[in-house]
From Swiss-Prot:
Main location: secreted
Example GO biological process: defense response to bacterium
Protein's name according to its UniProt entry: U15-lycotoxin-Ls1f
Post-translational modification: Contains 5 disulfide bonds.
Top-level taxonomy: Eukaryota, Metazoa, Ecdysozoa, Arthropoda, Chelicerata
């Protein structure tokens, strides 16, 4: 009986890890000079290895998702270009 309870608890723990929400990590940078703004990506498809395209004050960068909210996904769109962005 105890092994069945343990198996159920183990399964629930596994499912809670798999089904947890994922977010872009919060950027530690609060501001960036316009000449330093660069986009490494515009959408998630531009990233590899399960990383996401996340927006920061210095541009869009591929980051691995985290379970802590606070970051922002890159909006992408037709106007998004990779490389240095001069406004």
């Amino acid at each position: 009986m105890n092994s069945k309870i343990f198996a159920v608890l183990l399964l629930l723990a596994f499912l809670s890890c798999v089904l947890s929400d994922q977010y872009c990590p919060k950027s530690s940078i609060t501001a960036c000079k316009k000449m330093n703004i660069r986009n490494d990506c515009c959408k998630d498809d531009d990233c590899t290895g399960g990383s996401w395209c996340c927006a920061t004050p210095c541009g869009n960068f591929c980051k691995y998702p985290t379970d802590r909210p606070g970051g922002k996904r890159a909006a992408g769109g037709k106007s998004c270009k990779t490389g240095y962005v001069y406004y």
